[in-house]
């Protein structure tokens, strides 16, 4: 049972979804919160039947609960379209050099959202690296020549990677994750990727994977930026914002003790992603309800949950036997929606 801001009652709860595993030629992905068609998350911690039954899809929950799920401004802006996708990427080998279109181009070509994303590196092997952005200015003509002769990586900025590193990848930024990295990815609800260079390797079906070099040419931002990595200073028991953009805000929590989160101010659903350790996320205790009615979920490393807007008064309770618990908190800052 969740209590709304003005003691409004609804039967929503903190939600966990069944992970969706996807095998890739370079490793694997695990989609933990998704409303992408053909890959939609379904409820894992629901009831045996009813509106919150196990197996109910995320899009169906959004349609049923509307603003109580998404928040009022999100509901007015997105309607029944859940705006974010959360996945874990486990790269054993290098991913393709790629880029994603912005909203305007994606809507024009594919009838969907664009794809802006961010990465939080959870594990990185010795010598781990990734590509993000250009290190020198090139023209669309030079781009085509370098894709053709296989030298495109020579003009990309290569970053050495360590655990805890954060990279913001706006639509239009050329990029690639390389082998030996496991990361959490938060992005817009979109599965549109323009593959530019794929090391001349076959896919899992033995056939060469399709490239989208012409589509990518118009989607790429050729600007050279002074930095591509996000710097931040984490604090104990005090959330720190690490990404803020029109599509999502991400904060990191490093917690050693329970603390209370009043999330109503966001007017948004909130996603929690466990990066390390484990913790309980539970309804904040209220006099109005007995303790037995408090909704609780447990997250371990690599798990996530969604806190609907109607359940936005919670406690984060770490398992101190496991040391420091590290969480990402994700929501949509919808003040710009008016």
Question: Across the structure, where does each feature detected by a protein language model lie?
Answer:
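Compact, glycine/acidic-enriched structural inserts
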Residues: 127, 135-148, 153
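Loop-centered beta-sheet repeat module
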Residues: 147-194
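Short beta-strand segments in beta-sandwich/barrel cores
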Residues: 260-261, 277-282
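Ligand-binding loop in jelly-roll beta-barrel domains
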Residues: 79-81, 89-94, 103, 113, ...
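His/acidic/aromatic-lined binding-pocket segments of jelly-roll/cupin-type domains
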Residues: 86, 95, 117-120, 158-159, ...
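C-terminal amphipathic alpha-helical segment
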Residues: 194-266
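Transition-metal
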Residues: 1-138, 198-225, 250, 332-338
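Short acidic-glycine-tyrosine-enriched beta hairpin
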Residues: 156-168, 284-311
